[in-house]
Amino acid sequence: MTVKLLFQLFQLYFLLIYSSLEVEFKCTEDRKPISVNLKLHNPTAVTVSYKVRCTSADIFRVQPPLGFVKPSETVSIVIWYQNQDKKDAISKNHYFAFYHTNSDGRTARELWANSKVEGVRRLPASFLSTK
């Protein structure tokens, strides 16, 4: 198997269902920070821990960046774009990586310090200009 095929298979195994296929920021001329709300749903019968990473910590913030989703529960995540230098953001292919692993009773921070990722899904970021 090629590395690309393995990566695609790994992306398919993702337990959490999210509310969007991309993270869309509606940029304004006033350069105020923009937030997008995403929802993660756990359709399984076990508690799952998630971790969200972004391509640039300088222009994005994720709240909360890690946590737990109980069985059949939905959690909200807010992703912020600083909206300071729109040209730099648009010129790069930014994305958010959502990782998950099974919970084992530790806190989320302890769990992600050395846990093996069981699934990942990447959502691309897009920037729309509102005039």
Swiss-Prot record:
Superkingdom in the source lineage: Eukaryota
SUPFAM superfamilies tied to this protein: PapD-like
Pfam families: Motile_Sperm (PF00635)
Protein name as it appears in the record: Uncharacterized protein ZC262.1
Domain (MSP): residue spans on this chain: 14-130
PROSITE patterns found in the cross-reference section: MSP (PS50202)
InterPro entries documented for this protein: Ig-like_fold, MSP_dom, PapD-like_sf
